[in-house]
């Protein structure tokens, strides 16, 4: 029956669904609801193809083999759609290759367009208001025209031939409507489909017109000779099978709906309509030889009559019924196989879906179990923590209650006792508390002592760490200094080599080799012996390249030459430093000198009748005009050297190492940079050697070759005298001592409590007879920065004037 699923909410007709609904059989096609037509409506056979579509059955060939199962046939259902069963519209069950008839093998049946119509009379008698019509359209209607359905101009000649024949048979059907009253004879074997009682659930159908020659009798048909041959009969796809209680009626209706297969593959005997008695008499009078000739007024097609046909036996009728039964059974078997395949696939799909759902449920169950375990574990841990806390609170409260109870009991006992006993107990309690207090104070004192010891250890460790850091910095600075010194020495060596080569060339060109007169030496600036490099190469070169008087005498020179004749080309003018320009400097007005090698020197006149030389490599030298004081400061290794040529005394300060005081007679005083000791080595005129050492821990040690080492403790303010008490060492403190001598005074003291700014001050006493001022040189031992000043007394006041300063 047709459903209302194609009718929209607004009453409009929706497009029909091209697919079967879930659960419908393969042979149950969609049957549209067919309303009762009006009296003036055209018959069904005359409707257009849009309202009553027809199909073109394709011609089958030997290549179309029977499938193993109905599911393997292309039913037009998408593989992705698992909810729709396959149809049998394209099943090649009726292939002519499987038929036993030789005519079917030679002449395969062409495509036939089949349409079914209704009779208005039977529709009023046998149908209800809602009747279903079986259409030849396949259950699957593709979106685009299929290759199996062709237009009229694309049909073959055979198809057009059979199409015209079908139109003629439709005309015969209309003429046969008047003869239905004659078909009143019925038997228990079969009933014509046109005369069978109608069922409200199934539409009335008509027999399919026979396509064979009407003149061929039943004797000309090739019937199967055995059941094996009968089982091989090819079948065509059936239309919707009606359901009925009578098996014979069901077989007849099924046969009526499989007319295409009967037209295409085999002939069936022509069953004539029953004749009236007068007609039978008239037919018997005719010539029996013309029994096969049809009358023109006789219709070309009549309905099957399940009665005893004259001229045929009962076995032939039974055989025909058996053939139809087997055919219908084969059709039912095919549909059953299709339904079973679809059911199996549905079960498999449902099973897979259920397995997936079960797997998801199991996974969800596992997750819930894990989450439950975690929650349970967390709750247990939280419960244990709360229980422990409650237990601790309970124990604490219980102890407090016990103490309170003891106190109450003690108070009750005290109240029961007398005043004397009470005072006695109070005295004992006070004594006990005092003992506890003393013990606590003792422990606190011990703790303070331990803390003090620990602090001292930490302080020592900090000092050691600081010392190591300073040593590391000093080593780094020394390394840098040595690198710079090596670079400077290489440069000086190259320059000296060039100078030697130049002066050697000059010496080879001399006309005489007499000694240079003293006047030439006086024109050269004074050269002071020091550890620093000489800035006057001319003087060193003159000393180096002086030769004996007979070394460079020319061959052509006679003995009559004057011995005092000499050449002034010994020192060329280009090797002497000549003044270039004058400009103001940071210490006063200065003059810049330059030699032929490109070396420059800056000379500045300072107070105290001195000259300050600033060289291009950063070195500084200060010399007074009397040549009594010569101070040289090296920029590379930060060495400070003070020479007193008049007294033959030198004071050398090596950065981060020590201070040396060199006196005549190889008397040396060494002061370590960390002030660990002050060591003085003395050599007397009689050859006696003596060493005096002032340690930082307050010990005074004397050593010599003849006597044992003597060590004693000295007190601050101690004086040690020598050289008739004109020279001595004044020790004011461990970090403050002074070397007092007639020519100078050198004081070493600690600049701040940390000991990071230790300084020494050298005071050079000026000679009054030479109008010299006292010089004061202050040097920082940590940074090697210093200042040179003049100090003089004006009345009761001391006045200082800065000559120059130097920094890193």
Curated annotation (Swiss-Prot):
Residues 1-151, 187-206, 271-298, 511-564 are annotated as: Disordered. It is found in: Cytoplasm, Cytoskeleton, Microtubule organizing center, Centrosome. This is Spindle assembly abnormal protein 4. Keywords: Cell cycle, Coiled coil, Cytoplasm, Cytoskeleton, Developmental protein. Residues 161-181, 314-503 form a coiled coil. Residues 61-78, 85-104, 280-294, 511-529, 542-551 have a biased composition (Polar residues). Interacts with hyls-1; leading to hyls-1 localization into newly forming centrioles. Residues 124-133 have a biased composition (Acidic residues). Residues 42-54, 530-541 have a biased composition (Low complexity). One of its GO terms (biological process) is centriole replication. Required for centrosome duplication. Plays a central role in determining centrosome size. The gene is sas-4.
